């Protein structure tokens, strides 16, 4: 089954990439709010989970986070990271920049060694306040599943006006202070072949990554239930080949 996360705080969970991660969900607890509608999303399709409840307020997020950090300070476990993730796109919250300020202050107070991470699909990085907030966190993790304009509309299915080239330009503005995260998979969606592990997709993506020049690249494949059941994991060999190309490019 796909999953909808509690709000505004969930976990901690053990993350493959980040360690002991306390989740911060700025979206409603009863549904999904996202500018993407990815066919592999562990939260399901947007249409499956239309929320009826409001977004948590800045004050609710701050109070819930402080209470959880106090409990973890007393009873454990020690978090490696505080991660903005959950039921959709965290930067869509109207008070995302202020919530980042609150989170950094609480992190410094209770667990100064913990990192603050944001998992974002990059659709709001053109907003100056969002850009500045992402520049302040330890791990600014930005999604770039492809450099192909047609393929992204089959895989990530962005809402409204969306330009891959525009997003790549926005990512370049971070001047290396970002981590690129990319999903590689195979299988189909309806009558569409969704395999993005071939050079047709990998090489243009690699050129885009070189342009962005991030400090790190995360490549991964499906690990949890997906709303479309015809999707398949990329193999270890395929991921290793792509990783080798990234390393050869100096990242």
Residue ranges and their predicted role:
Residues 58, 100, 202, 235, ...:
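Amphipathic alpha-helical segments in well-structured domains
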Residues 2-26:
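Short, charged low-complexity linear segments at domain edges
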Residues 44-81, 95-98:
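Conserved alpha-helical substructure of the radical SAM core
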């Amino acid at each position: 089954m796909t999953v909808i996360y509690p709000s505004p705080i969930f976990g901690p969970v053990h993350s493959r990439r980040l360690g002991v991660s306390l989740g911060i969900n700025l979206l409603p607890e009863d549904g999904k709010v996202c500018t993407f509608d990815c066919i592999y999303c562990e939260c399901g399709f947007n249409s499956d989970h239309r929320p009826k409840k409001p977004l948590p307020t800045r004050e609710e997020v701050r109070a819930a986070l402080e209470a959880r950090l106090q409990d973890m300070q007393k009873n454990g476990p020690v978090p490696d990271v505080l991660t903005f993730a959950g039921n959709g796109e965290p930067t869509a919250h109207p008070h995302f920049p202020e919530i980042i300020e609150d989170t950094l202050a609480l992190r410094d107070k209770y667990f100064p060694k913990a990192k603050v991470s944001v998992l974002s699909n990059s659709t709001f990085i053109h907003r100056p306040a969002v850009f500045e907030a992402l520049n302040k966190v330890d791990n600014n993790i930005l999604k770039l599943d492809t450099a192909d304009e047609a393929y992204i509309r089959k895989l990530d299915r962005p809402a409204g006006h969306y330009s891959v080239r525009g997003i790549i330009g926005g990512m370049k503005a971070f001047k290396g202070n970002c981590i690129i995260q990319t999903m590689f998979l195979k299988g189909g969606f309806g009558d569409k072949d969704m395999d993005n592990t071939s050079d047709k997709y990998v090489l243009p993506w690699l050129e885009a990554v070189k342009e962005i020049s991030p400090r790190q690249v995360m490549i991964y494949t499906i690990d949890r239930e997906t709303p479309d059941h015809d999707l398949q994991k990329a193999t270890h060999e395929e991921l290793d080949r792509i990783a080798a190309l990234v390393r050869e490019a100096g990242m």
